[in-house]
């Protein structure tokens, strides 16, 4: 089972991934975590060429997405051959790239279409790679008092308005996924409660329930 965990800046994505990686093994489900590719490239000295030409920027986005898909495929292949039910947790997924390339204007949409054409990809196929998508809304929407532009991710830094706009682009890119869960900051009194909304959604998914059943059957057989 592959799940994309995404969202806006300071939405709680990193904390949610850590929490899931700790809790799922208690249910008999092994966890593999795919790091956010932007952060991985940043750490490798291949940061986004913000001052480069548009062609250089688009090339970076293309190679980042290609690397992400390859890493996802590798982890899923390893998980498929494991005797233990395994969940692959993605720190962002393929459609996050759309949010950062197609930034709302015609030029951005054209750039995204160029990127898809170069890779031989289409949005429907990219979406279908994931069994579920969890979007944790930035605290810049609905919990502004908790928002800090100095996020845990050194690769990016956004003010409130930028974080709000980015969050909306990301959720728009993903929202047509049939198993899309939007976890907002409304009607929650704490981040723990926000996280419970995300985990409850995940634990109700048919694919997850099948994994738990498989693990139980294997335990009985032993």
Language-model-derived ranges and their functions:
Residues 16:
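Hydrophobic positions on the alpha1 helix immediately C-terminal to the Walker A/P-loop
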Residues 21-67:
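Conserved substrate/cofactor phosphate-moiety recognition/catalytic segment
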Residues 100, 104-172, 185-189:
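A glycine- and Lys/Arg-enriched "phosphate-lid" helix/loop adjacent to the NTP-binding pocket
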Residues 152-155, 162-222:
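NTP-dependent small-molecule kinase module
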């Amino acid at each position: 089972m592959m799940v994309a965990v995404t969202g806006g800046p300071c939405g709680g994505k990193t904390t949610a991934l850590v929490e899931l990686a700790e809790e799922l093994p208690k249910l008999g489900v092994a966890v593999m975590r795919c790091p956010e590719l932007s952060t991985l490239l940043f750490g490798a000295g291949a940061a986004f060429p913000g001052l480069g030409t548009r062609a250089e920027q688009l090339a970076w986005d293309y190679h980042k997405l290609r690397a992400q898909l390859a890493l996802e495929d590798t982890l899923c292949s390893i998980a498929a051959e494991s005797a233990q039910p395994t969940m692959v947790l993605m720190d962002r997924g393929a459609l996050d790239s759309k949010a950062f390339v197609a930034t709302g204007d015609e030029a951005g949409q054209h750039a995204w279409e160029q990127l898809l054409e170069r890779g031989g990809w289409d949005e429907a196929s990219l979406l279908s790679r994931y069994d579920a998508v969890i979007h944790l809304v930035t605290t810049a929407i609905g919990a502004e008092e908790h928002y800090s532009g100095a996020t845990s991710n050194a690769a990016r830094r956004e003010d409130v308005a930028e974080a709000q706009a980015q969050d909306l682009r990301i959720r728009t890119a993903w929202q047509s996924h049939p198993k899309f869960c939007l976890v907002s900051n409304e009607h929650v009194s704490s981040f723990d409660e926000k996280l419970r909304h995300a985990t409850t959604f995940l634990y109700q998914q048919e694919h997850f329930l099948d994994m738990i059943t498989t693990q139980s059957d294997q335990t009985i057989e032993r």
